[in-house]
Swiss-Prot record:
This is Cardiolipin synthase (CMP-forming). The keyword Transit peptide applies. Residues 32-44 have a biased composition (Pro residues). Residues 1-34 form a transit peptide. Catalyzes the synthesis of cardiolipin (CL) (diphosphatidylglycerol) by specifically transferring a phosphatidyl group from CDP-diacylglycerol to phosphatidylglycerol (PG). CL is a key phospholipid in mitochondrial membranes and plays important roles in maintaining the functional integrity and dynamics of mitochondria under both optimal and stress conditions. It is a multi-pass membrane protein.
Length: 329
């Protein structure tokens, strides 16, 4: 201890002893010493840390004692040196290193580093579910419908006794696979987000292409010669409805669940699709001039096409009313 400090402390003690004889109560009492550090650490509480106290506790107590001594003897405060302990370990997080650290969990807890799975099995031995397949059987059938659109256009403009039959067969196969891929996806649980996106696109491409083909090259019968607009009006109604519903469903995908439920497929939409596919199949098949009662086939096909257009507009109105009620709430 420096001599000046010792002299100063000795004078303070003598003054305190002299004052004790004059006053019953001492006018000066030194500060209480800091609490002693227990020799053995206390056991951790239930649910607490499972690690024993480290040098951090001892270093903190030493720093507290040094600060109290500096205040007593009016020394300059000691420099705050960095204390190396358990809390000073680097965070493991998601950065480099990959070791275990403290993170933001507090002292005594370790952050678990999850290793990526290799060949479907994690490093800890737990099996991981396989990633979903992109090309399932329903998705392949849907892609086949999209690829059949150029083939349908090619056979429609071909000349020959087999051209009408080939065009009708392609469209009929597309209509059957439209039902088949949904059935397989539900029964075998093979549905994928990509397939759910591509299925309505394939349907609209096939229907729109067929309607445009029938309008650009109408059948040579008396009914269509007198009224060439008979095919144009339902074609515009059906295509316009499909474009509108595609935009509405795209908007509903960004809204809440109630809006999505409002645009779900209903029975009107199913009846519309059934009458639409039947009408287009009849109109494509009636292009074969060898078929008997060609005029009757064309008339029935046009009538079903108008029924399909009416159901399309009706279902669109129903969807819009549901959405409007939800928006007004």
């Amino acid at each position: 201890m420096p001599p000046s400090v010792a002299t100063h402390a000795s004078l303070l003690l003598k003054a305190a002893a002299a004052a004790a004889h004059l006053h019953p109560k001492p006018f000066f009492s030194p500060r209480a010493a800091p609490p002693r550090i227990p020799s053995a650490p206390a056991p951790p509480a239930a649910g607490g840390s499972r690690y024993r106290p480290t040098t951090t506790t001892t270093a903190a107590a030493t720093a507290t004692s040094a600060t109290a001594a500096c205040r007593w003897f009016r020394w300059p405060p000691p420099a705050q040196a960095p204390v190396r302990g358990l809390c000073s370990l680097p965070h493991s997080g998601g950065g480099g290193g990959g070791g275990e650290g403290m993170g933001s969990e507090g002292v005594g807890r370790r952050r678990r580093v999850v290793a990526p799975a290799v060949n479907g099995v994690a490093k800890d031995g737990a099996p991981q579910p396989p990633p979903p397949k992109l090309l399932t059987l329903p998705t392949v059938l849907t892609i086949g419908r999209v690829a059949a659109v150029p083939l349908l256009i090619s056979t429609f403009y071909m000349e020959g006794p087999w051209a009408a039959t080939a065009t009708t067969g392609i469209f009929l196969a597309a209509a059957v696979t439209d039902w088949l891929d949904g059935y397989i996806a539900r029964k075998m649980q093979l549905g994928t987000p990509f397939g759910a996106f591509l299925d309505p696109v394939a349907d609209k491409l096939m229907v729109a292409a067929t309607l445009v083909l029938l309008c650009t090259k109408p059948l040579e019968i008396s009914l269509l010669r007198d009224g060439p607009w008979l095919l144009t009006v339902p074609a515009i109604a059906i295509i316009g409805r499909e474009i509108t519903m595609s935009a509405v469903r795209e908007w509903a995908a960004s809204q809440n669940t109630k809006v999505l439920e409002a645009v779900a497929v209903n029975n009107l939409g199913k009846w519309k699709t059934a009458t639409q596919m039947t009408a287009l199949t009849i109109l494509l098949a009636s292009r074969d001039k060898s078929l008997p009662a060609q005029d009757a086939l064309v008339t029935s096909g046009i009538a079903l096409l108008y029924v399909s257009a009416g159901l399309a507009i009706w279902s669109l109105v129903v969807y819009m009313r549901k959405i409007w009620r939800i928006l007004l709430k």
